[in-house]
């Protein structure tokens, strides 16, 4: 199976081309065709010799993904189900915001983190995506915009889809460098957010990268007992380790950390728990932000339900009174399979039923 050329950073592409007897500018031309003209085949690169196009075709594919399902919401949210070269399925979401167009990308096939409320973890991790497969998600959404010919572009990226990004650290970092490259898609680092469930050692590594990319942490509970019961990762990285790493990140980068907090009815949404959360984040209040997220129910996790609006607002009020920077997240795509992993899970179930029916 040939790798996608999207797996290479610009420097790596230059090195690869020079090793094959090409001038550096040839790699720059190829990069422009990929990320500025956004061609889908090497044959479309009209200023590249046929001999070198043949070498490119022997070495790489361009976009490795195949579109399986597209769902479009009344609010303009678009959910894509893509098939990988090995037949596995991943999800990508386009969200139209007042500030631009944001894309949520997947980094793994399945997830091993084991959050008990999440659709993504219904199927255990089968493999990491390579950086080309992650970048290809952005390129296909941008192609959707290009085909519409309305001058739209992907302006923001959130690495919050299926999988734990920091469990696929090397490929995620390569992806970030490709989409941030000023000579390509040029998506600003401060318009990119990577979300982790709390791999403390990788948060420290991320702090040392020197990138201006935003960091979000999936917190979802204000104490170790509750967090360990709903997020298995907390047993390896309890709040003490997690917050030590977060404090290191803030000290090293002077950048704000966003805490994601899904509101689960009568699980983590009490007034007492709101006060615990305010106390937990007290020492980093100036450089932290809490995002309260309405829960998208998942049929396989029917022990959980969405917090009623009045409980969310009461929780929010406690945080605000304690000086916590916080917001209730705007919902997108509520009329489609909005929860991360739902569309993939449903499609895989249908595929299995078709196979069974033909036997």
Swiss-Prot record:
GO biological process: rRNA base methylation; tRNA methylation
Disulphides: 104-340
Molecular function GO labels: 4 iron, 4 sulfur cluster binding; metal ion binding; rRNA (adenine(2503)-C2-)-methyltransferase activity; rRNA binding; tRNA (adenine(37)-C2)-methyltransferase activity; tRNA binding
One Gene Ontology cellular component: cytoplasm
Amino acids binding [4Fe-4S] cluster: 111, 115, 118
PROSITE patterns: RADICAL_SAM (PS51918)
Names of the cofactor(s): [4Fe-4S] cluster
Catalytic reaction(s) noted: adenosine(2503) in 23S rRNA + 2 reduced [2Fe-2S]-[ferredoxin] + 2 S-adenosyl-L-methionine = 2-methyladenosine(2503) in 23S rRNA + 5'-deoxyadenosine + L-methionine + 2 oxidized [2Fe-2S]-[ferredoxin] + S-adenosyl-L-homocysteine; adenosine(37) in tRNA + 2 reduced [2Fe-2S]-[ferredoxin] + 2 S-adenosyl-L-methionine = 2-methyladenosine(37) in tRNA + 5'-deoxyadenosine + L-methionine + 2 oxidized [2Fe-2S]-[ferredoxin] + S-adenosyl-L-homocysteine
UniProt keyword list: 4Fe-4S, Cytoplasm, Disulfide bond, Iron, Iron-sulfur, Metal-binding, Methyltransferase, rRNA processing, S-adenosyl-L-methionine, Transferase, tRNA processing
Active site: residue positions: 91 (proton acceptor), 340 (s-methylcysteine intermediate)
InterPro entries: Aldolase_TIM (IPR013785), Methyltransferase_A (IPR040072), RlmN_N (IPR048641), RNA_MTrfase_RlmN (IPR027492), rRNA_lsu_MTrfase_RlmN/Cfr (IPR004383), rSAM (IPR007197)
PANTHER family attached to this UniProt entry: 23S RRNA METHYLTRANSFERASE, RADICAL SAM CORE DOMAIN-CONTAINING PROTEIN
Protein task: Specifically methylates position 2 of adenine 2503 in 23S rRNA and position 2 of adenine 37 in tRNAs.
Family: Belongs to the radical SAM superfamily. RlmN family.
Protein name in UniProt: Probable dual-specificity RNA methyltransferase RlmN
Organism of origin: Streptococcus pyogenes serotype M2 (strain MGAS10270)
Protein's gene: rlmN
């Amino acid at each position: 199976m040939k790798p996608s050329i999207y797996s290479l950073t610009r420097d790596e592409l230059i090195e690869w081309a020079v090793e094959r007897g090409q001038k550096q500018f040839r790699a720059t031309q190829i990069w422009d065709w990929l990320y500025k003209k956004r061609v889908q085949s090497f044959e479309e690169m009209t200023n590249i010799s046929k001999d070198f196009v043949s070498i490119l075709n022997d070495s790489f594919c361009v976009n490795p993904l195949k579109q399986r399902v597209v769902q479009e919401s009344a609010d303009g949210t678009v959910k894509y189900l893509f098939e990988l070269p090995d037949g596995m399925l991943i999800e990508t979401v386009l969200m139209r915001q007042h500030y631009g167009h944001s894309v949520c990308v997947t980094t793994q096939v399945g997830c091993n983190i084991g959050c008990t409320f999440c659709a993504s973890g219904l199927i255990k991790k089968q493999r990491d995506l390579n950086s080309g497969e992650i970048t290809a998600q952005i390129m296909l959404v941008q192609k959707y915009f290009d085909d519409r010919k309305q001058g739209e572009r992907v302006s923001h990226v959130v690495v919050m889809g299926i999988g734990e990004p920091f469990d696929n650290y090397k490929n995620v970092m390569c992806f970030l460098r490709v989409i941030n490259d000023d000579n390509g898609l040029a998506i600003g680092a401060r318009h990119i957010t990577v979300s982790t469930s709390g791999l403390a050692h990788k948060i420290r590594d991320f702090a040392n990268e020197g990138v201006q990319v935003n960091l979000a942490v999936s917190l979802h509970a204000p104490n170790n007992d509750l967090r360990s019961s709903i997020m298995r990762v907390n047993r390896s990285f309890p709040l003490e380790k997690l917050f030590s790493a977060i404090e290191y990140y803030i000290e090293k980068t002077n950048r704000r950390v966003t805490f994601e907090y899904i509101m689960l009815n009568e699980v983590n949404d009490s007034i007492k728990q709101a006060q615990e959360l305010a106390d937990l984040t007290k020492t980093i209040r100036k450089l932290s932000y809490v995002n309260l997220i309405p829960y998208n129910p998942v049929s396989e996790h029917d022990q959980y339900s969405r917090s009623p609006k009045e409980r969310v607002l009461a929780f929010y009020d406690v945080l605000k009174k304690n000086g916590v920077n916080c917001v209730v997240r705007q919902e997108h795509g509520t009329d489609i399979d909005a929860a991360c992993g739902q569309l993939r899970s449903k499609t895989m179930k249908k595929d299995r039923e078709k196979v069974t029916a033909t036997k």
